[in-house]
């Protein structure tokens, strides 16, 4: 437990300003506990699986360079760095996730990132690629080999390791809105809560959110107030339940947002709507919540 707490506290924040700025390291020194933990660990011997080795290139190889953010919590005194990898695009799939998987499988097994469905459904592989928050499985590799690609973890998140962000605060906020159907009365037929076609249509553009956090971590207001401001993703989810005709706790849901921080830190910067890999519009959902609260309380 002590190791986990030390790692989370001193994991660097990937970005301080903007979505593609130079990394700044924290000014705060490493604690004595973290140093002791690091010193007490035996050194890891280099093996074939831990040695970075570029694959052999063919004569007609279409090479592209990827610069990837690296940070290892097992070496807390080492600063984050960018590590470069060169791949032959002729032997690599079309998506950024294909490149990352090939690097991990064939070049550097120590590279760490999240991934699961590879179809833009789970949201696991959210990261910042060439200055844009997106899903690696949906982001195509630019075919222009002269331009090098830079890959970072999601901006302004604590880093667990390499491209893995700490989503603890994000999911804590999601839990706070009670993202489930709340009713005091049972359905008339005792089977299910029915909904008209028109009411169901009101949920389009809301239920598709996969909680990848691309929008929230692109929002400057969320960067500055992430402890109190819920952020675009959670507010879109909140509107999804406020707008659900089957839910009977609409008033309570609005009351929970009726303070100066949870909702009203949105300043319509619209980064969230621009970056959403699913094409949703969190800014519109936030505006609709504000409008409904202004007219109905």
Curated annotation (Swiss-Prot):
Q: Where does [3Fe-4S] cluster bind?
A: 219, 266, 272
Q: Where does a ubiquinone bind?
A: 224
Q: What Gene3D superfamilies does the entry give?
A: 3.10.20.30, Alpha-helical ferredoxin
For the biological process aspect of GO, one term held by this record is: tricarboxylic acid cycle
Reaction catalysed by this enzyme: a quinone + succinate = fumarate + a quinol
Keywords assigned by UniProt, alphabetized: 2Fe-2S, 3Fe-4S, 4Fe-4S, Electron transport, Iron, Iron-sulfur, Membrane, Metal-binding, Mitochondrion, Mitochondrion inner membrane, Oxidoreductase, Transit peptide, Transport, Tricarboxylic acid cycle
* Cofactor(s) this protein requires: [2Fe-2S] cluster; [3Fe-4S] cluster; [4Fe-4S] cluster
Q: Where does [2Fe-2S] cluster bind?
A: 117, 122, 125, 137
Q: EC top class, in one word?
A: oxidoreductase
What is the protein name given in its UniProt record? Succinate dehydrogenase [ubiquinone] iron-sulfur subunit, mitochondrial
Give the source species.
Answer: Zymoseptoria tritici (Speckled leaf blotch fungus)
């Amino acid at each position: 437990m002590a190791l986990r707490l030390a790692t989370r506290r001193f994991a660097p924040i990937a970005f301080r300003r903007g979505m593609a700025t130079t990394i700044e390291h924290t000014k705060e020194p490493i604690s004595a506990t973290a140093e002791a933990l690091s010193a007490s660990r035996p050194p890891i011997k280099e093996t074939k699986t831990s040695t970075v080795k570029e694959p052999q290139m063919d004569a007609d190889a279409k090479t592209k360079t990827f610069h990837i953010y690296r940070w290892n919590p097992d070496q807390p005194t080492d600063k984050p760095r960018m590590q470069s990898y060169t791949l032959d695009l002729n032997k690599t799939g079309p998506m950024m996730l294909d490149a990352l998987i090939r690097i991990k499988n064939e070049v550097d097994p120590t590279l760490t990132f999240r991934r699961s469905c590879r179809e833009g459904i789970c949201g696991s592989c959210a990261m910042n690629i060439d200055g844009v928050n997106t899903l690696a499985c949906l982001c195509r590799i630019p075919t222009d080999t002269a331009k090098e690609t830079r890959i970072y973890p999601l901006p302004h998140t604590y880093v667990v390791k390499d491209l893995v962000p700490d989503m603890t605060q994000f999911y804590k906020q999601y839990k706070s809105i009670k993202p489930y159907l709340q009713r005091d009365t049972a359905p008339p037929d005792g089977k299910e809560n029915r909904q008209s076609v028109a009411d169901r249509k009101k949920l389009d553009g809301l239920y598709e959110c996969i909680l990848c956090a691309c929008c929230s971590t692109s929002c400057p207001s969320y960067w500055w107030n992430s402890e109190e401001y819920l952020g675009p993703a959670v507010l879109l989810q909140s509107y999804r339940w406020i707008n659900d005709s089957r839910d009977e706790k609409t008033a309570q849901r609005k009351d929970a947002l009726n303070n100066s921080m949870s909702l009203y830190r949105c300043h319509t910067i619209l980064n969230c709507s621009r970056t959403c890999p699913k094409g949703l519009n969190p800014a519109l959902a936030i505006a609709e919540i504000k409008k409904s609260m202004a007219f109905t309380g």
